[in-house]
Swiss-Prot record:
Disulfide bonds: none
Keywords: Actin-binding, Cytoplasm, Cytoskeleton
One record GO biological process: adult locomotory behavior
Region described as Tropomyosin-binding: 39-138
Location of the protein in the cell: Cytoplasm, Cytoskeleton
GO cellular component terms attached to this protein's record: actin filament; COP9 signalosome; cortical cytoskeleton; cytoskeleton; membrane; myofibril; sarcomere; striated muscle thin filament
Described purpose of this protein according to its UniProt entry: Blocks the elongation and depolymerization of the actin filaments at the pointed end. The Tmod/TM complex contributes to the formation of the short actin protofilament, which in turn defines the geometry of the membrane skeleton.
Organism whose genome encodes this protein: Rattus norvegicus (Rat)
Protein name in UniProt: Tropomodulin-1
Family according to the record: Belongs to the tropomodulin family.
Length: 359
């Protein structure tokens, strides 16, 4: 309580009156005391990190050379402090000597005929390069030895030094022939419901317009004979996928659909998969290798639709996560098992299949 009473004495003081009563020297002292400087601020120069602690006038400009001379003279005049323990120069420990590597016994056992050893011992660099060129051992020569030997006239076999080593001859692989399918003619045959046309292959035909691909999807709605339809690498996009999804809801004949290596996004793929419950004839669907990844959310929705489908036997897509991959594999395995049981039922009698969980 006494401390609070002491503080109340200074609550009603007039600061302007107190400052007006101070002298010029007292104001200068107060200014120095209130000068806020940070000594730990590394961004400020050393002279600005603290207050000016002297009022003396400078004796002259700063000269670095004179300061260094003064410090050197002062260091020579004052004797160094003696060591508490004098240095005796005694060496302790053992001198490190590297171990000699053992010689290769194979190299030690190599012996040549006396005449050959004498010839190699007295051979010049040009003669050694000549031997290396004849034997084809170009790694025995350094670059300096190579150019010196090449410039000398005493070397015999200069062709061996400059000889070109022939690479391995590979069999030329011809480019894949372009797809011979006539786009317009095939479209007309689908519209006319040609019974001889059961497979449509438009793979790698990159100049097919998007309206033409959508016209194919519209024509397949009424076609009764086409069982395989493939448009791999045709630059198909989401509008084509939406048209194919509408076709799957109506078509009851198509068994294989391949739309790999295109520009279909996750929305187009989901639309295709969501059309599977309305289709009972499709047994194989391939959607892998699109221009952009589908994402975890789209993969989970695809798996949920696959688990509800009982007719699809092959699904061509590489899932990025292990969970959806295993669930899709189990769904395809169960569908193939149902086909096997139906086939056995036709031969031996009715077999009641096990109910799939979550369906």
């Amino acid at each position: 309580m006494s401390y609070r009473r002491e503080l109340e004495k200074y609550r009603d003081l007039d600061e302007d009156e107190i400052l007006g009563a101070l002298t010029e020297e007292e104001l200068r002292t107060l200014e120095n005391e209130l000068d806020e400087l940070d000594p730990d601020n590394a961004l400020l120069p050393a002279g600005l990190r603290q207050k000016d602690q002297t009022t003396k006038a400078p004796t002259g400009p700063f000269k670095r050379e004179e300061l260094l001379d003064h410090l050197e003279k002062q260091a020579k005049e004052f004797k160094d402090r003696e060591d508490l323990v004098p240095y005796t120069g005694e060496k302790r420990g053992k001198i490190w000597v590297p171990k000699q590597k053992p010689m290769d016994p194979v190299l030690e056992s190599v012996t040549l005929e006396p005449e050959l050893e004498e010839a190699l011992a007295n051979a010049s660099d040009a003669e050694l390069c000549d031997i290396a060129a004849i034997l084809g051992m170009h790694t025995l020569m350094s670059n300096q030895q190579y150019y010196q030997a090449l410039g000398s006239s005493s070397i015999v076999n200069k062709e061996g030094l400059n000889s070109v080593i022939k690479p391995t001859q590979y069999k030329p692989v011809p480019d894949e022939e372009p797809n011979p399918t006539d786009v317009e003619e095939t479209l007309e045959r689908i519209k006319n419901n040609d019974p001889e046309l059961e497979e449509v292959n438009l793979n790698n035909i990159r100049n097919i317009p998007i309206p033409t691909l959508k016209a194919y999807a519209e024509s397949l709605k009424e076609n009764s004979y086409v069982k395989k339809f493939s448009i791999v690498g045709t630059r198909s996009n989401d509008p084509v996928a939406f048209a194919l999804a509408e076709m799957l809801k109506v078509n009851k004949v198509l068994k294989t659909l391949n739309v790999e290596s295109n520009f279909i996004s996750g929305a187009g793929i989901l639309c295709l998969v969501e059309a599977l419950p309305h289709n009972t004839s499709l047994v194989e669907l391939k959607i892998d290798n699109q221009s952009q990844p589908l994402g975890n959310k789209v993969e989970m929705e695809i798996v949920n639709m696959l688990e509800k489908n009982t007719t699809l036997l092959k699904f061509g897509y590489h899932f990025t996560q292990q969970g959806p991959r295993l669930r899709a594999s189990n769904a395809m395995m169960n569908n193939n098992d149902l086909v096997r049981k139906r086939r056995l039922a036709d031969l031996t009698g009715p077999i009641i299949p096990k109910c799939r969980s979550g369906v």
